[in-house]
């Protein structure tokens, strides 16, 4: 047999990272815009700007700073590089009576986000795929050839289980990357509790790492049997081809939701984690005896003031997502022969298709199978390749017009 093996390694990285202005510049430009519109009451107090200027001057700021948080969400959550790898093994060989080809493949597309594996789930973005193909051709006799073909793939897509009960969760997730405030709260406060905005659900690090995980499993299978038979023993130039194809596809979703109550939608995973937001009174700094400066603050706690703490994983379940199968069979009778200056050919084809799938509105319900049937015929004639004639006919239908 002939054996070949290939391995490919690649890396990916963002072509460009967004750049942000510092908070002091943003506040000053904001005040200028408000002044132009005469919205004096909406302007940021000078005491706040001064406090932040001092924080920048002394380096007293950062993504985990309680009083002066500054988070570059892109820098904190996006890696410089992500990796992918692919392997493929091919084997071919055979004899005069039989030939074969077998191929096995594996692909792994790694994560470009900085996620942290949790005790009960892995929130990373990743994709794994296994694919296979095998072709077997048998020369049963000098006039009979039989082929078996099998192919398929199995894919596993993993991602955080964010925004479970909203439309377009992926779109909303990536939008949060650019809309999450940079200076309203730290990733985590010094007491270890996640930070969050005044409007809640704005800490994308908490959302991505603590919101659970979703694993989508997808399978596709393709199966073919083809028979080619020469019928010269009946009349020269006559042949028959019969084929049968069967295709299946299915997908499941395994979802882990911390605090999720099965059968209800009243708890979104990320909301089961304790988060706080602090608003500091920069206008009234407190000068301590040791030379440090502190500020009083008001604190808001999520999901509510009496929340006891993070809830354990409350929902782990396999959800049937979609299923489909297709059956196709065909019988073709072909005749081609030359009588001196006369060429005659004829073709008759019969095929039937069946398609069955789950209802898109309710994945637990199967649609009625759809059927299509075709009867096709063609006859051609030419004399010295100068005078040509062709006759075609077809009769088609489906269960919709029975």
Predicted regions and their residues:
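Outer-membrane beta-barrel transmembrane domain signature of Gram-negative proteins
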Residues: 69-92, 174-195, 267-401
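Outer-membrane beta-barrel proteins
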Residues: 14-18, 111-115, 145, 157-161, ...
